[in-house]
């Protein structure tokens, strides 16, 4: 039987990335709360080296 987690960077960025967070009101609220907490990584697409991809 196939496992449930089949990692894909493209799907990861599209589902949890910065653009998706900015596209909805609740997503912007998530970013605001992560900024307020002082997170260095706001979203999965803001990781080191992947910001331009």
From Swiss-Prot:
This is Large ribosomal subunit protein bL34. One of its GO terms (cellular component) is ribonucleoprotein complex. One of its GO terms (biological process) is translation. InterPro entries: Ribosomal_bL34 (IPR000271), Ribosomal_bL34_CS (IPR020939). The keyword Ribosomal protein applies. It comes from Chlorobium limicola (strain DSM 245 / NBRC 103803 / 6330). Belongs to the bacterial ribosomal protein bL34 family. Keywords: Ribonucleoprotein, Ribosomal protein.
């Amino acid at each position: 039987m196939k496992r449930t987690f089949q990692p894909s960077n493209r799907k990861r960025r599209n589902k949890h990335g910065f653009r998706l967070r900015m596209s909805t009101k609740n997503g912007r609220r998530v970013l605001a709360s992560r900024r307020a907490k002082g997170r260095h990584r706001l979203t999965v697409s803001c990781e080191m080296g992947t910001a331009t991809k």
